[in-house]
Amino acid sequence: MSKPPLFFIVIIGLIVVAASFRFMQQRREKADNDMAPLQQKLVVVSNKREKPINDRRSRQQEVTPAGTSIRYEASFKPQSGGMEQTFRLDAQQYHALTVGDKGTLSYKGTRFVSFVGEQ
């Protein structure tokens, strides 16, 4: 039986290290969001986006194939001025928003909690 080349062992090691780093980074971000205080701001919905998750990067693919998972994002701009913030949302939360809506945004760290529109 021949010995695998050192090059492939190094590449596999780098992949394992990179995957471990990313995993720990995600766990740290989740813990930070869980510990963050609930913050609320008066905002305006400034933008909404739907992105296919498994984008095949094909330049000729103009229509998203059926069954493709979608990532929903919405951007909010503070009514008092300031930087726009973008959050990932569930489909139900996303479809309840309309660009230009004003209301109270609640969030913890980088995690969207809720948006309550003004009456």
UniProtKB/Swiss-Prot annotation:
Record-linked InterPro entries: DUF2500
Q: Which named protein is this?
A: Uncharacterized protein YhhM
Q: What is the lineage of its organism?
A: Bacteria, Pseudomonadati, Pseudomonadota, Gammaproteobacteria, Enterobacterales
Question: What domain of life?
Answer: Bacteria
